């Protein structure tokens, strides 16, 4: 309702239906989700294989060859690293950054280890090894800052401060739902739940599925591997970090300077920097409305880790004045 003002009841009903459709199946309306079985994704976010879905000017992704929008790039496959990330973050730095991860009160005690991180990181070409030393350090700081926010056990008066308590949690707290969305491409396994696990708290079958395929693990049938195998756990987070989800760039490309904002990005104040990474991860809830405590928590971790690694945070670290990547999508389809 906040996008357009309608006075006629019929217009309100049309908007309601469009909103329901816009988040239904694929494309920018569904966070970059892809259609199963080779079907086309229409401009309105539905999957199909007729001209209404695949025809020129009617298809936004997974389109037939020929004129039309470019399909979403494939998920990057982990490969040999072009350098050694241990030159950027040592074991002692890792322990200093995640100082209280092994506290007795932390659910993830003794799970997140330096060796597991290094093993996982070396499986992804370019992670922590792209660009000059400044860019490499910022990527490591940004990755651990965002994942520390997702797994934090800190509070304002915590020993050593709230930003020394990243990686305290391993599984989503409370009584989470199954996070199963009907999908022929990534079907949920009987009895399995796809709630948040690991450093990035990966959720939903449509994330566990492609992540597992990329790292060589059947996470649809065994999602808890993300919470029982530390290398797999770190790989799930790095996979998310390295993977673009249209219309969003990858976190990796943003922090390493490989992403160039479009005119629409610039108009939305989405400029290169740590703030865009927060926008990628949770911009729909946290960005675009001024100061937000969750955003400030992410920034607090980032500043601390940059200090430990000996690098400046760079520009545009907040997203309070940025529009989320999903804002305005309804207008673009009308």
UniProtKB/Swiss-Prot annotation:
Signal peptide as annotated in the record: 1-23
Keywords, sorted A to Z: Carbohydrate metabolism, Chitin degradation, Chitin-binding, Disulfide bond, Glycosidase, Hydrolase, Hydroxylation, Plant defense, Polysaccharide degradation, Signal, Vacuole
Chief location of this protein within or outside the cell: other
UniProt biased composition (Pro residues): 66-79
Keyword match Metal-binding: no
GO cellular component entries: vacuole
Catalytic activity line of the entry: Random endo-hydrolysis of N-acetyl-beta-D-glucosaminide (1->4)-beta-linkages in chitin and chitodextrins
Residues found modified as 4-hydroxyproline: 73-74, 76
Highest taxon listed in the record's lineage: Eukaryota
S-S pairs: 26-41, 35-47, 40-54, 59-63, 106-168, 180-188, 287-319
Stored CDD domains: chitinase_GH19, ChtBD1_GH19_hevein
Gene Ontology terms: biological process: cell wall macromolecule catabolic process; chitin catabolic process; defense response; polysaccharide catabolic process
Molecular functions (GO terms): chitin binding; chitinase activity; endochitinase activity
Active site annotation, chain numbering: 150 (proton donor)
Entries under SUPFAM superfamilies matching the protein: Lysozyme-like, Plant lectins/antimicrobial peptides
EC numbers, comma separated: 3.2.1.14
InterPro entries: Chitin-bd_1 (IPR001002), Chitin-binding_1_CS (IPR018371), Endochitinase-like_sf (IPR036861), Glyco_hydro_19 (IPR016283), Glyco_hydro_19_cat (IPR000726), Lysozyme-like_dom_sf (IPR023346)
Region described as Disordered: 64-84
Start and end residues of each Chitin-binding type-1 domain: 24-65
Cellular compartments annotated: Vacuole
Posttranslational mods: The 4-hydroxyproline residues are not glycosylated in this plant vacuolar protein.
Propiece residues: 328-334
PANTHER family given in the database record: CHITINASE-RELATED, ENDOCHITINASE A
Family: Belongs to the glycosyl hydrolase 19 family. Chitinase class I subfamily.
Function, as annotated: Defense against chitin-containing fungal pathogens.
Name of the protein in its database record: Endochitinase 3
């Amino acid at each position: 309702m906040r996008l357009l003002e309608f006075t006629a009841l019929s217009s309100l009903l049309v908007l309601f239906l469009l909103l329901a459709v816009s988040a239904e199946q694929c494309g920018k309306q569904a966070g970059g989700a892809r259609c199963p079985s080779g079907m086309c994704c229409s401009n309105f976010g539905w999957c199909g294989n007729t001209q209404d879905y695949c025809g020129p000017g009617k298809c936004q992704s997974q389109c037939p060859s020929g004129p039309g929008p470019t399909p979403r790039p494939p998920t990057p496959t982990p490969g040999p690293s072009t350098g050694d990330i241990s030159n950027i973050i040592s074991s002692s730095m890792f322990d200093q950054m995640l100082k209280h991860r092994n506290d007795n009160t932390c659910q993830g005690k003794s799970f997140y280890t330096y060796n597991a991180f290094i093993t996982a990181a070396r499986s992804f070409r370019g992670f922590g090894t792209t660009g000059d030393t400044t860019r490499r350090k910022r990527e490591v700081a940004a990755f651990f800052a965002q994942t520390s926010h997702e797994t934090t056990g800190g509070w304002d008066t915590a020993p050593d401060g709230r930003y020394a308590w990243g990686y305290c949690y391993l599984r989503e707290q409370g009584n989470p739902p199954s996070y199963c969305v009907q999908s022929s491409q990534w079907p949920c396994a009987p009895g399995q739940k796809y709630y948040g696990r690991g450093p990035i708290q990966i959720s939903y079958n449509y994330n566990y599925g492609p992540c597992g395929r990329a790292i060589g693990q059947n996470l649809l049938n065994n999602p808890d591997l993300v919470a029982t195998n530390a290398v797999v756990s770190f790989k799930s987070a790095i996979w998310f970090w390295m993977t673009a989800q249209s219309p969003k760039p990858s976190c990796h490309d943003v922090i390493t300077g490989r992403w160039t904002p479009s005119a629409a990005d610039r108009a939305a104040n989405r400029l290169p920097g740590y703030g865009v990474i927060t926008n990628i991860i949770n911009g729909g809830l946290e960005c675009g409305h001024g100061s937000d405590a969750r955003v400030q928590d992410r920034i607090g971790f980032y500043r601390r880790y940059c200090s430990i690694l000996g690098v400046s945070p760079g520009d545009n670290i907040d997203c309070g004045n940025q529009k989320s990547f999903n804002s305005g999508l309804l207008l673009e389809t009308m």
